[in-house]
């Protein structure tokens, strides 16, 4: 019996470089190496994504309705397209003036008296307060003992860069997204992009398999941390606001899969959400491969969607000394003014990584189904390799897992295509860490493989 090979027949999604399908995002990343024609097409495509121009009545038009050709679009919008993509200073909020509160304490020796609206009194009156009614609507409060107040203030983030979706591209504008957290909005658009990249409608694809042979494998390791979910839930009472009935369910890390099943595919087959820090995409792929290779699944939608660019997530990771900081970049670059475009430096002289948001999906089939349907095959998955790090003093420190899983992957490739192909006709496409400790071990793994 021949072993089933899971193959990639479609891919799509969105990140800071733009749309993934048909390599738009990749072309933006390597734009300085493109031919003039490819560069022009990439700029025009991104200008459309960013809402600078649109395709209407078989012509490109700007927001004022003026008809433009590709050359004019490049001349007019190239700088804006390039500066509004990839890693850049945070645009979602003002990272230099993040709203917050300053705790102020009045010592017990000094009583404090103030007037306030009666309706603004807390439900549970502090024990140190004496409340005197002045009218039907006003009271006077006198404090006896130490009293604390939270006063509206602002603070500055130490890390001010992120990999954000292109400026002007707002997922919520493309469908009815009321109450949906940003990460779920991105999941809806990302999976649609992947499915449409196949070139065969989902209705036609699903006719060739039974419902139980379709699987959706998707998750979000952080869950949803925006105001519509955990972000709003955890801050509501501290801000004097109420929680909503949607914040808890929409925050769950399985929601990307649930949204895809319910709002995109109408899937009644298998569904699964697996997470594992920055390896979550690998974990979802591993789950899909397991089911395809066993014959349980023949058509799978696989991916993840994350939208963690919030002040709280930035602060939390900065407190771990994980994120690149302004002071850190000044130190290693020897400059006063930091270029946030250069904040992420995998395998280079760096001082941390950057936050990013992205929605990335692939569509997998078993090789027999792909050949039957005549789909384009972009690649295959002979296997996935995952190893834990064993005992170590710090959970975020490097461990032997990198060496073990990578050596297993290379060994699998050697068995599949032979030593000569690996030496002369292969390359390693690596995700590089921007943390000083991990970059050393990851570089070591790649060096050993090259040798």
Where are these regions (language model features)?
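Conserved catalytic cysteine-centered active-site region
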Residues: 43-49, 90, 138-185, 223-287, ...
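Active-site-proximal alpha-helical scaffold in enzymes
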Residues: 186-200, 253, 257, 271-306, ...
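Acyl-CoA/ACP chain-elongation machinery
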Residues: 296-351, 384-398, 432-439, 451
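ACP-dependent fatty acid/polyketide chain-elongation machinery
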Residues: 1-173, 368-380
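Short, well-ordered amphipathic alpha-helical segments that serve as non-catalytic structural scaffolds
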Residues: 186-199, 254-257, 284, 366, ...
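Conserved small-residue
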Residues: 191, 216, 281, 288, ...
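Structural signature of cysteine-dependent C-C bond-forming condensing enzymes
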Residues: 1, 199-215, 232-245, 262-270, ...
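Condensing-enzyme catalytic core mediating Claisen C-C bond formation in acyl metabolism
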Residues: 2-16, 23, 27-31, 328-421, ...
